[in-house]
Structures are given as structure tokens and as C-alpha cells.
Design a protein with these regions (language model features):
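N-terminal secretory signal peptides that target proteins for export/translocation
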Residues: 1-17
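Hydrophobic helical h-region of N-terminal Sec-dependent signal peptides
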Residues: 22-30
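Short, solvent-exposed loop/turn elements at domain surfaces
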Residues: 295-296, 328, 423-426, 507-513, ...
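Short amphipathic alpha-helix adjacent to the substrate-entry channel of hydrolases
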Residues: 299-315
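Serine-dependent carboxylesterase/thioesterase catalytic core
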Residues: 74-81, 90, 94-106, 111, ...
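Flexible, membrane-associating and regulatory peripheral segments of lipid-active enzymes
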Residues: 34-285, 294-300, 316
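Extracellular/periplasmic catalytic domains that process cell-envelope and extracellular macromolecules
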Residues: 278-280, 311, 349-351, 358-359, ...
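C-terminal subdomain of alpha/beta-hydrolase-fold enzymes, centered on the catalytic histidine
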Residues: 440-567
């Protein structure tokens, strides 16, 4: 009997354990949108070209256009030297006046192909000194210390993720170097700095008995052209490919879970990271993720922006990462601080005083603090006395910044994606309580609250806020429960600038009545909470709390951004 009872207890405990783990797994699944981001690989192509002992090439400058075209057509493609001759021939042809469409298309295509065949094996060897082939020496204009990936060497595993190439001439690639953490590198991803690069023919000349081929290798941050004779050709470059190679190397997605359950461990990675070079002439777009998430959720949207030449030339993309277990208002204060730091160090970035904010789920709550004027409403919802009656120490003013803030920019465009403006019912469910129990708040946050409350006294907390301040502060899940005072107050604050909403649904995609709208729910946030009265326009898309990757929502965001470029 005792054995049976013991076995029964074991089975009961095991069942309870499995149920709890199942709830945790469900919570994690519902609250996040993370997935594997390994979608490309790199092929290392070895040259199949043979080499000659003696290289020589004719002077094509005085050859008539049509004769030169026929000569280029007749050249071989078997050896490295053949490819150099073809490159020199097409280079001369591209400088001729009045090329036919067929001649120009041929010349550009063969120029690019021959150059790619020449440099691909050289880059694979990662040698920065001249490469010697008999009496032919090949070198690059700039000795770039880092890794280079040619676009022809990128093997895409996910056909939905593609990159556009802007331009027509030269070989496009990606240059990658380590992040030095110095200067502007402090605002770039820690995984490294990834930039588009273009290769083109610099010069081919004979020095004594030797031939020297020099190849221009230029990092392109915007469209540039190459003058050849009286003709101008735009150089190939691909901002989206640089981002894809960065994402393939990124490890920030490994901090989604850690950032939620133990935010202190992930705090070192907190920041705002510019995907491209900081640019005073481009409007920043800040993309902010939600609970148990990371910046890689913005993969498809970021690619769409980088693949659109007009939008790429108008906007610069910044990704925010924050450990999501800490409450959103604390995280918002930290992100505002980082944002203002960037703008203070680079005042030119703020010359238009215009910003775009795109937030998913709780990230929308974080972003909302960037575009609202709080006055003392959030403070009054928390404390019974005004700041000037409570603030005494320098650390107290850090506390004030959590509750009192102004819009960062004068002009704003806000996109709220699956955002629980009134909280999420799942945060109040058993799943939410289990998720909340997993979170260990960081000492930095707890110490800030503890020292302040111990000094002013818990009696200075409002009755509504008091339950949330047990153990010196709520975590993010507790803050997102419907009825939280700060979320309610923030929901009523006017948003400065234009507002758009993207709402997810696992069922119907539109609603005309209150009863119908109750059916719109993405599994985490319902329509009532996701709907924002201040939105100029909202759309409902098929989504399980992952509208950030929905094609309809991406098209909607891009369309609104294009409208903004016309203003």
C-alpha cells in the first residue's frame, strides 16, 4: 500500500511538473516570435582558370567601337589572363560613345563576370599583398582589414529572404570588420560592422616587362557612379546583403529568453544599434521588440526597407535591444537615454527633429513613451507627492525619468504592431503568473527602487500602485496585466505625430461591431487592447502575435513611409 501511495505521489508530482512546464512552454511560445535565423551559407569558389607564363594585352583605346565589340566577343575565357583581357576590352568598350543597347548590355555583363572570376579566388585566400601570376600582378587599391563576401558566393536557403542590388557596374559584395567599440562603432551591432562594397577596374598598365592590374575596392554607403569616357555608370552595391550577412553572424537572438527571465545577465547587450552608417540626412527608424524577443524579429521588415531604393535613401534603421524581464517603463527610460546620447553626440542627426517608431507588442508600450508628453500623470499615479517634494539625491532623478518625459523628436510617425495598449489578458492568466514567477529582476533596478522607497516611505505610494511595488518593483509581465495604473494612464496620453496600428488576428480580419471585434485576437493581445483611438489608420492581419513578419503589415508600413517622403 505504501509503495502504491508513493508511486501515486510520484505520478502526481510528475504530472504537476509536466503541466507547469507545458504552461511555461506555452507562455514562451505565445509571448515571443523567435525562430532560427540560419538561412544562408557561404561558398568558397576555387578558380578553375589556368594561368599563362607570359601575359600581354593589346591597347584597345584606338580601336573603333564596332570593331572593339567584335574583338571582345571573340576573346577566350579559359585562363585568368583571358579574363583580364576581357575585362580590359569591355572596360575600353564601355568608354566608347553611342553604344547600342546590345553592345552596352554585353559590355556590362562581361565586365562584371570577368572581374568576379578574377577576384573571387583572390579574396578566398584572404591575402592583402599583390598576387603574382608570372609577369601579371593583381592588387587592390585599398588594403581593407576584414572579411569580404561576394554576392555570388552567398547561398540563400530561404527564398523569401532576398537582397536587391542597386546599380549596374562592378562586383558587389559585403565587407565585414570587428566592432572596435570606439567612436561610432559604439552605435553599431557588437557582432561587427557590415557594409556594402564594390569592386571595379582601377587600372591596367605595363611597367617594364610586368603588367599591373589594380582593382578599386570601395565601401559604398550610397549610390555612386563611375565615369568612363563620356559615359556614366552606377556602381553595384547591396545594403540588404550586408544586413543579411550580419544577421547570419548575429547571436543577439540567444538573449531573448535570458533577457526575460534574468535581465541582469543580458544588460550588457542593451542598446540602440544602427544597421548602417549614421547619416545626418536620413530620418531614423527605431524598431523595438517585445517580451522574450530580440531585434531579429525585424528581419523581413528591415530587408524590405533596405531593398527599396527610395526608402533606403530616406531612412536609417536603428534596432533597440533591451532585457525584457524588467518593466517596460524602466526599459523605456534606458532606451530614451541611449537615444538622446546618440543625438547629443551627433547633433546633425536631429536637425530635422523627426523620427519613426515601430514597436511590437510590449515594444509598442516602450516606444509610446518616446512620442508622448507625460506631465506628472504617471508620477501622480505612482506617488502621492510631487517630485520636488520627494527628490533629494542625484539617484532620485533617475527615478523621475521613468515617469516624467517629453517626446524625443518634434515630428513623429508611430507604428504599433500587436501592441497591448490596455494590457494583455494572458499576463493575468495562469500562464502569465507562471511566466512572471520565472523572472528575476536585476539588482540595478531593485536597488534603485529599494533605496528610493526606503527613504521616502511606502506610505508615499498610491494605493493602486502599492500592490505592484511588493519586493520593490513589478516585472514586465506584472506591468502588462490589464488594470495596471501606468499602462492605463499611458493609454490616455495624446501621441505626438501620426499613428498607425497593425492588429493581429487568428480568426476574422475585420470587424464592424463590438461583438465582432471581440473575436479579433492574436492569442496574446485582443482587439480591444490593440486598438488605438488615435490611429489614423489600422489594419487587421492574419497573425499569431507575429504581425511584424506578415507581408500585408510590411506593405502597409512601407506605403505609409513612402507617403511620408512626399511631405
Amino acid at each position: 500500500m505504501l509503495g502504491s501511495k508513493a508511486n501515486g505521489i510520484k505520478l502526481y508530482v510528475l504530472s504537476r511538473f509536466k503541466s507547469k512546464m507545458l504552461m511555461i512552454i506555452i507562455f514562451v511560445f505565445l509571448a515571443s516570435g523567435c525562430s532560427s535565423y540560419k538561412f544562408l551559407s557561404f561558398k568558397k569558389k576555387q578558380s578553375k582558370l589556368s594561368t599563362e607564363k607570359i601575359f600581354s594585352v593589346a591597347d584597345f583605346s584606338n580601336t573603333a567601337k564596332d570593331d572593339l565589340y567584335q574583338l571582345c566577343l571573340s576573346l577566350g575565357r579559359e585562363t585568368l589572363e583571358d579574363m583580364v583581357r576581357l575585362l580590359a576590352c569591355t572596360n575600353a568598350l564601355l568608354a566608347k560613345d553611342a553604344l547600342s543597347h546590345q553592345q552596352q548590355k554585353f559590355a556590362i555583363t562581361e565586365y562584371n563576370l570577368s572581374l568576379n572570376e578574377i577576384i573571387s579566388p583572390l579574396l578566398n585566400n584572404k591575402q592583402h599583398t599583390p598576387h603574382n601570376f608570372g609577369n601579371l600582378s593583381i592588387s587592390f587599391d585599398t588594403d581593407l582589414q576584414g572579411d569580404i563576401y561576394l554576392l555570388s558566393d552567398l547561398l540563400m536557403h530561404d527564398q523569401e529572404l532576398q537582397f536587391s542590388v542597386f546599380g549596374e557596374l562592378g562586383v558587389a559584395g559585403v565587407f565585414a570588420r570587428k566592432n572596435t567599440a570606439q567612436g561610432n562603432d559604439a552605435y553599431y551591432p557588437l557582432e561587427g560592422v557590415y557594409r556594402p562594397i564594390n569592386f571595379s577596374l582601377s587600372e591596367l598598365r605595363k611597367v617594364g616587362s610586368k603588367w599591373q592590374l589594380k582593382i578599386a575596392n570601395e565601401i559604398l554607403l550610397q549610390q555612386k557612379s563611375k565615369i568612363m569616357g563620356k559615359n556614366k555608370y552606377s556602381l553595384n552595391y547591396s545594403p540588404a546583403s550586408a544586413y543579411l550577412v550580419l544577421v547570419e553572424q548575429a547571436d543577439i537572438d540567444q538573449l531573448s529568453w535570458t533577457g526575460m527571465i534574468n535581465p541582469g545577465e543580458a544588460d550588457a547587450r542593451r542598446g540602440i544599434f544602427a544597421i548602417e552608417e549614421l547619416n545626418d540626412n536620413k530620418t531614423p527608424i527605431l524598431m523595438t521588440h517585445g517580451l522574450n524577443s530580440d531585434p531579429l524579429i525585424w528581419l523581413k521588415l528591415t530587408l524590405a526597407l533596405l531593398n527599396d531604393r527610395e526608402l533606403h535613401d530616406t531612412f536609417q534603421i536603428w534596432h533597440a535591444y533591451y532585457p525584457s524581464g524588467s518593466p517596460p517603463f524602466y526599459n523605456a527610460m534606458m532606451i530614451r537615454k541611449r537615444l538622446k546620447n546618440i543625438l547629443s553626440k551627433h547633433p546633425g542627426l536631429n536637425k530635422k527633429s523627426k523620427g519613426v517608431f515601430i514597436g511590437h507588442s510590449m515594444g509598442g508600450i516602450v516606444n509610446k513613451t518616446m512620442v508622448t508628453s507625460s506631465g506628472y500623470q504617471l508620477w501622480d499615479a505612482t506617488y502621492t507627492l510631487k517630485p520636488d517634494e520627494l527628490l533629494q539625491q542625484s539617484s532620485d532623478y533617475e527615478m523621475e525619468k521613468i515617469f516624467v518625459f517629453e517626446p524625443v523628436f518634434e515630428k513623429n510617425i508611430s507604428f504599433f504592431v500587436d501592441t497591448p495598449h490596455k494590457g494583455s489578458n494572458i499576463a493575468s492568466s495562469l500562464v502569465g503568473y507562471l511566466g512572471s514567477a520565472l523572472i528575476t529582476l536585476p539588482d540595478k533596478f531593485l536597488d534603485l527602487n529599494r533605496s528610493f522607497i526606503n527613504r521616502i516611505g511606502a506610505d508615499k505610494l498610491t494605493l493602486r500602485m502599492l500592490p505592484y511595488m511588493q519586493n520593490f518593483g513589478p516585472n514586465s509581465v506584472q506591468t502588462m496585466r490589464p488594470g495596471h495604473p501606468l499602462v492605463e494612464v499611458l493609454d490616455e496620453l495624446p501621441i505626438h505625430g501620426k499613428v498607425y496600428s497593425v492588429i493581429g488576428s487568428q480568426s476574422i480580419l475585420s470587424c464592424q461591431s463590438e461583438q465582432q471585434c471581440l473575436e479579433v485576437n492574436d492569442g496574446v493581445v485582443d482587439y480591444i487592447s490593440a486598438h488605438n483611438q488615435q490611429a489614423e489608420e489600422e489594419i487587421v492581419v492574419s497573425s499569431s502575435h507575429d504581425s511584424y513578419k506578415n507581408e500585408k503589415s510590411i506593405s502597409f508600413i512601407l506605403a505609409k513611409l513612402r507617403e511620408a517622403t512626399l511631405e
